[in-house]
């Protein structure tokens, strides 16, 4: 039979474990000290017998289902069922578990003893609605309706009366209205009663008026008409007007309209000739043009004479002639040459009336082919709408030019969400600038050009210095140079340059061919050959070099110095790394090979004072990890193991008890008096440190023997201090005699043993 757990037993049996009982803890009646406890006899049921019927006979027997044959239940039983027999007077536990309602007195609050938070909340609908503002509004509305109805009836009645009675009636009505207002202000309650009486006096027929005769239209001739002059208010301008508008490097004269709010650009008219915006530029270009060829001058003169009556810059299309553009050619010669005839400069014959600021075309005709400098696209930063972009927010450091679109390497927190540089496409940048920052689309190309120009500066061509062209000071050479053509000058200059370059070229080629073999000679390179190890390491030099002794010593000293320098540098580097790791919080770097028990305590003390929550120790052997966990327990910290095999280490964490409890230093001192040193098991120790911690082994000397050598040949004679020799001398032995009795003295010379390294000694032979 399976064992029954203790929580299935009664409360008394579960706690009764007497020492004198035969069945301890198994329902024994004895207590802890062996005394007997009287058990109360349990009745057949939990209901008490009573002669009082349940609910005075009005209710059924509650226990009839599980206790048939019983028809009476005492009041104590009912109280026990609903509220508990031994419950406190105001126990929330029993009141929540039982379905009863204690101290239910919602009507009488004084008689009820229950707290207000335990009483049920009841909502009762009011019989009357208390709204004083609503009543006042209703009264005022009724008063206004009666007053308006009386005025309408009186006005309609006065239409049919004589004109003489109208004045008296009006005075009477005004007096009556004033009296009514005084009465209303003095006695407001009386007006409420009069309103109901007035409403009852007015009949329904008096409320409506039927006009049987049509109303005659008034005579408009008798109405006087007055003409009122409108006074024009002076227009206040908050911005100071500047008659000169500067756009880039162009200045335009601007005029302000008197009545209209428009600003126009004044274009000067020089007589009947119409001003052209490029007239000055064209005249300067034509003024500076000249040709040295006389044939070209004659050809130009023929063209001018043949087309003198026609415009010089006439277009072949007939539509341009209809538009009214009439060009007149004019040409000025810069040189004082009378042979060249001047021609008139091209000018427009159509008048340009006005140029609007907003770019609208106000002049007549279809002059789309003409463009003014003011209509060209301005650079970024010359318009007010350009300042919606803060160049400090969008920092572009690089650009990748593409066939269709470009990519930008920029930093923008609003676009990217961080302060790092990222590559983004041009579409993403334009959408952000237009949608998010609000830059107009017409200014977008100017902004992109601004970014490109800031990253890729324009390279201006260098001015030619003509330093490679020889210039003579003599007047003869100057005259001859001016008389020759430009092509002859170039040929002469190139010949002079080539002659200077070729000077000494033959000698240079000869020298190069002479030393060509030595220049391209290859040398065999290999590492230095050495012998020995450590401090005994020396340079091995070939005897075929036939170097003298001084040179060999110099090479050996340099080689040894090189080795010492490398060792010092390596040692200094290791010392520097160790010094830096001593102040590190990482214990794997701080203790590269092992740690002392005092180091473990110091680490716990520093960890207790720091704000860190975790501390990881280096991997130790199982006993070392267990020691660290014991110390962590005495410091009121939580410890756990991480890793596997040789990489198992202990991690210490702080808990709530660590802050409010002090460490147990007595137990910590006991652990410190035990094992002192703990080495790491995840790395190998160097030989020097391994020899310091491990037991050194005795090293026996190695003896070398030679072929044919007699064993013990050089051994000294046994002296008189030897106790064995003294005993033999007492027995009658003398030096040089053999050992034995009389007649059998033995040999006087010992048998010699020779070393034979080329013999195998006695061995078993098959023969």
From Swiss-Prot:
GO terms for cellular component: cytoplasm; nucleus. GO terms for biological process: mRNA processing; RNA splicing. Residues 594-656 form the R3H domain. Residues 720-767 form the G-patch domain. Its main location: cytoplasm. It is found in: Cytoplasm; Nucleus. Residues 1-60, 176-200, 466-493 are annotated as: Disordered. Residues 176-185, 474-492 have a biased composition (Acidic residues). CDD domains: R3H_G-patch. The modification Phosphoserine is found at residues 105, 217, 255, 334, 343, 345. Residues 42-52 have a biased composition (Polar residues). One of its GO terms (molecular function) is nucleic acid binding. Keywords: Cytoplasm, mRNA processing, mRNA splicing, Nucleus, Phosphoprotein. Pfam families: G-patch. Residues 1-17 have a biased composition (Basic residues). Belongs to the SQS1 family. May be involved in splicing since overexpression antagonizes the suppression of splicing defects by SPP382 mutants. This is Protein SQS1. It comes from Saccharomyces cerevisiae (strain YJM789) (Baker's yeast).
């Amino acid at each position: 039979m399976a064992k029954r757990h203790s929580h299935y037993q009664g409360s008394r049996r579960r706690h009764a474990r007497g020492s004198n009982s035969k069945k301890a803890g198994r329902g024994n009646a004895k207590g802890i000290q062996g005394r007997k406890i009287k058990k109360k006899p349990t009745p057949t049921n939990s209901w008490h017998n009573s002669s009082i019927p349940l609910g005075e006979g009005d209710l059924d027997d509650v226990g009839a289902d599980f206790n048939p044959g019983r028809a009476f239940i005492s009041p104590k039983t009912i109280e026990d069922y609903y509220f508990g027999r031994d419950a406190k007077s105001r126990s929330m536990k029993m009141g929540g578990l039982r379905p009863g309602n204690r101290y239910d007195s919602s009507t009488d609050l004084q008689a009820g003893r229950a707290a207000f938070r335990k009483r049920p909340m009841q909502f009762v609908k009011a019989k009357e609605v208390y709204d004083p503002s609503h009543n006042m509004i209703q009264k005022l509305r009724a008063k206004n309706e009666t007053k308006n109805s009386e005025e309408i009836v009186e006005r309609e009645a006065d239409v049919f009366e004589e004109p003489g009675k109208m004045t008296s009636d009006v005075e009477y009505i005004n007096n009556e209205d004033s009296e009514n207002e005084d009465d209303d202000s003095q006695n407001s309650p009386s007006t409420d009663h009069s309103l109901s009486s007035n409403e009852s006096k007015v009949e329904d027929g008096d409320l409506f008026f039927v006009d049987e005769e049509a109303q005659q239209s008034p005579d408009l001739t008798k109405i006087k008409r007055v003409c009122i002059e409108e006074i024009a208010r002076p227009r206040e301008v908050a911005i100071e007007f500047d008659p000169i508008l500067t756009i880039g490097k162009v200045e335009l004269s601007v005029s302000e309209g008197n009545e209209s709010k428009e600003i126009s650009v004044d274009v000067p008219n020089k007589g009947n000739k119409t001003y052209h915006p490029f007239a000055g530029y064209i005249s300067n270009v034509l003024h500076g043009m000249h040709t040295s060829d006389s044939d070209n001058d004659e050809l130009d003169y023929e063209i001018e004479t043949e087309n003198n009556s026609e415009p010089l810059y006439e277009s072949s299309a007939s539509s341009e002639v209809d538009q009214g553009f009439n060009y007149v050619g004019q040409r000025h010669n810069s040189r004082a040459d009378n042979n060249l005839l001047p021609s008139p400069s091209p000018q427009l014959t159509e008048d340009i009336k006005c140029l609007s600021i907003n770019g609208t075309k106000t002049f007549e005709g279809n002059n789309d082919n003409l463009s003014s400098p003011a209509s060209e696209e301005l650079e970024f930063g010359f318009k007010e709408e350009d300042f919606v972009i803060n160049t400090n927010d969008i920092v572009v450091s690089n650009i990748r030019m593409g066939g269709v679109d470009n990519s930008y390497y920029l930093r923008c927190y609003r676009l990217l969400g961080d302060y790092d540089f990222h590559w983004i496409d041009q579409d993403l940048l334009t959408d952000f600038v237009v949608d998010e920052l609000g830059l107009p689309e017409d200014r977008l190309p100017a902004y992109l050009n601004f970014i490109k120009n800031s990253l890729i500066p324009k390279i201006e061509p260098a001015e030619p210095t003509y330093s490679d062209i020889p210039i003579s000071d003599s007047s003869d050479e100057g005259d001859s140079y001016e008389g020759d053509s430009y092509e002859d000058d170039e040929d002469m200059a190139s010949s002079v340059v080539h002659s200077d370059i070729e000077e000494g070229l033959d000698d240079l080629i000869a020298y190069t061919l002479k030393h060509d073999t030595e220049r391209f000679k290859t040398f065999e390179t290999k590492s230095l050959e050495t012998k020995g190890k450590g401090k005994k390491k020396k340079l091995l030099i070939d005897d075929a070099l036939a170097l003298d002794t001084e040179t060999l010593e110099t090479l050996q000293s340099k080689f040894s110095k090189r080795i010492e320098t490398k060792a010092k540098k390596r040692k200094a580097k290791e010392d520097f790394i160790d010094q830096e790791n001593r102040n590190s919080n990482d214990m794997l770097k701080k203790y590269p090979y092992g740690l002392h028990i005092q180091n473990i305590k110091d680490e716990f003390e520093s960890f207790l004072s720091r704000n860190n929550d975790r501390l990881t120790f280096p991997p130790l052997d199982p006993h070392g990890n267990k020691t660290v966990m014991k110390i962590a327990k005495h410091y009121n910290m939580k410890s756990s193991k991480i890793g596997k095999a040789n990489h198992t280490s202990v991690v210490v964490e702080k808990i709530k008890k660590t802050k409010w409890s002090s460490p147990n230093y007595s137990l910590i001192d006991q652990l410190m008096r035990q094992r002192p040193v703990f080495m790491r098991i995840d790395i190998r120790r160097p030989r020097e440190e391994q020899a310091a911690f491990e037991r050194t082994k005795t090293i026996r000397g190695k003896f070398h023997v030679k072929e044919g050598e007699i064993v013990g040949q050089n051994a000294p004679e046994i002296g008189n201090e030897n106790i064995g020799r003294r005993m033999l001398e007492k027995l009658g032995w003398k030096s040089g005699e053999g050992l034995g009795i009389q007649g059998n003295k033995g040999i006087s010379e010992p048998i010699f043993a020779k070393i034979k390294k080329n013999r195998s000694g006695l061995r078993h032979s098959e023969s």
